[in-house]
From Swiss-Prot:
Pfam families: Ank, Ank_2. PANTHER family: ANKYRIN REPEAT AND DEATH DOMAIN-CONTAINING PROTEIN (PTHR24125), ANKYRIN REPEAT AND DEATH DOMAIN-CONTAINING PROTEIN 1B (PTHR24125:SF1). This is Ankyrin repeat and death domain-containing protein 1B. It comes from the Eukaryota. The gene is ANKDD1B. Keywords: ANK repeat, Repeat. It comes from Homo sapiens. GO terms for biological process: signal transduction. The keyword Repeat applies. ANK repeats lie at residues 67-96, 100-129, 133-162, 166-197, 201-230, 234-263, 267-296, 300-329, 333-362, 366-395. InterPro entries: Ankyrin-DD_containing_protein (IPR052457), Ankyrin_rpt (IPR002110), Ankyrin_rpt-contain_sf (IPR036770), DEATH-like_dom_sf (IPR011029), Death_dom (IPR000488). Signal peptide: none annotated.
Amino acid sequence: MDPAGRARGQGATAGGLLLRAAAAAKGLREDLWGAAALPWRSLSRIPKREGLGEEDTAVAGHELLLPNERSFQNAAKSNNLDLMEKLFEKKVNINVVNNMNRTALHFAVGRNHLSAVDFLLKHKARVDVADKHGLTVIHLAAWSGSLEVMLMLVKAGADQRAKNQDGMSALHFATQSNHVRIVEYLIQDLHLKDLNQPDEKGRKPFLLAAERGHVEMIEKLTFLNLHTSEKDKGGNTALHLAAKHGHSPAVQVLLAQWQDINEMNELNISSLQIATRNGHASLVNFLLSENVDLHQKVEPKESPLHLVVINNHITVVNSLLSAQHDIDILNQKQQTPLHVAADRGNVELVETLLKAGCDLKAVDKQGKTALAVASRSNHSLVVGMLIKAERYYAWREEHHESIRDPSTGFTLTFKQDHSLETRHIRTLLWDLAYHQLKANEWQRLARSWNFTDDQIRAIEEQWSGNESFREHGHRALLIWLHGTLMTQGDPAKQLYEELVHAGFPKLAEKTRHFKSKTDSNSKKCVVS
């Protein structure tokens, strides 16, 4: 070739590359926009993108689409037959692939566009192309659930036994998407029972149906004798997978076939523990109604109650306690559920466990009570709640009253008090702590009120510095107020008398003028 010819050829090549690059940039934007609507987004785990070498970059460049090729794929996505016809007449390559190795047929099948699929198959579109995740059009037809498209693809010679990179066949995809007609066609018409194989996770189609909670599919696979009690590579049965996602109806159907409601997976976790860990309250209630073993011995030892406390599922906590779950059961660290809740500073869970009458004296492997754990973790609100509870239950025991059956009329709570009824007395206590009491004087008061040394230390462990005694004293006074209201006493009157008894007569006098404001409200106060 002469130099001029070579120059023209190089110019044409450069122009073509520029054209393809511009089209690729536009096409990438369109692909990203369109991906959200495509069914195959969730069909395969997307591998992590690695850096491209020179050879990879060159390959990627060849995958970029020209404008007409991009338009043709977009026409297939939107079922635009007129545009597909026009572009086909312009000799567009109908089998061209995009950067994900997908053809126009992938898009048409994925969106159930019968007309576009028919057009492509009549013009000899390839049915054997797998995208970068191994997905073929037969997989997409099974996923999208169009029996008509499936029939067309089978007639065109699509590989009925193809698997993607995750080892999933058309039967897996149809099962996962709950397309019963597709499953019936594959098994009863095409006799493809050999597709009933585990995927790369060790899951047969039956396990996928259970994981998705597809009751109709579970029943159909059972009818077709494709059910299994086998476990996947994680040691999960169909029951475990259904429980993980809270599929109560599916669990009910599965339990009708297998009676071992307490079967463990490879991690020694039962269905109840899976359901509690994930906070599936309705499923937990169903399993409890089926007499599931509440206190199954497992390693590592985390009871259902520990699991719901760890994962903050308070509704499930109430269900377990109503079913008589051992409230003081120990885990491998010899922690009760209260220890765990206190360590996390979870006020609502601590409140629930305290009101249920848990053991406040239980110690873990380090010899720490829940109070010591909360104090160490700097959860001052929980520390206050635990001290209130210790004093409350000590008072009930002294008066021989049932912990679970309070005789007094107040609403029991150990939370911080924000009620209007106690506003005046709380104002007095704040003034007393921050303006009247000197360093070390609140401890004298606390001991006169029978606070234990552990309780005083727990209060002192939060906050530090020269002025910290004011905050400590205020917290102790509020805890005392809880006990006074608990016994239906008059807070202002009792405060006056006890200040005198503790050796603070001048401070006692300063409380007198609050009495008239609190007399009418003290009997109505809610314990906090």
